[in-house]
Amino acid sequence: MTLRRGSCPLLLFSLVGLLTTCAQEPDAAGQNTTAVAEKAGTCPQAELEMPDRNCTEACQSDAGCEENKKCCRTGCGTSCQIPDEKPGSCPNVDTPIPPLGLCKTTCSKDSDCSETKKCCKNGCGFMTCTTARP
């Protein structure tokens, strides 16, 4: 192959255009390959048996969801959902005597708790909504 004079800039511009196009191509999941910050928490488990299945692709990534909601699979689509697990960790429960009035289960997962509270062990074998440690 012989290159004619003046053809190198054309070749260079073609390569730059190709690299720019490849960098913006969506990946196999249909999301852009540029990194988008993922929000904290884990998506609720998608229900496999749903009578009226919602197959709508309501979001592409967590960035498309408001507040602390995450873009989660719904069985055959996606939707913005409140995550099961919230950021932070449960406080240590080291009391030899369990706190009065808290010996009952009030939650089973973080999404059962309001705002930033987490579902944690309460010292007497049950789970309750507690303020999380950072």
Curated annotation (Swiss-Prot):
The answer to whether UniProt assigns keyword Signal to this entry is yes
Against InterPro entries, the record matches this protein to: Elafin-like_sf, WAP_dom, WAP_four-disulfide_core
Q: Name one GO cellular component term.
A: extracellular region
Location relative to the cell = Secreted
Q: What is one process in the GO biological process aspect for this record? A: innate immune response
Q: Which residues form the WAP domain?
A: 36-82, 83-133
PROSITE patterns (UniProt xref): WAP
Disulfide bonding pattern of the chain: C43-C72, C55-C76, C59-C71, C65-C80, C90-C120, C103-C124, C107-C119, C113-C129
Report whether Repeat shows up as a keyword of the record: yes
UniProt signal peptide: 1-23
Q: Name one Pfam family in it.
A: WAP
Q: Which domain of life is it from?
A: Eukaryota
**Which tissues and organs express this gene's product?**
Expressed by the venom gland.
Sorted alphabetically, the keyword list is: Antibiotic, Antimicrobial, Disulfide bond, Repeat, Secreted, Signal
Molecular functions per Gene Ontology: serine-type endopeptidase inhibitor activity
Q: Which family does it belong to?
A: Belongs to the venom waprin family.
Its function? Damages membranes of susceptible bacteria. Has no hemolytic activity. Not toxic to mice. Does not inhibit the proteinases elastase and cathepsin G.
- Under which name does UniProt file this protein? Waprin-Phi1
Q: List the source organism.
A: Philodryas olfersii (Green snake)
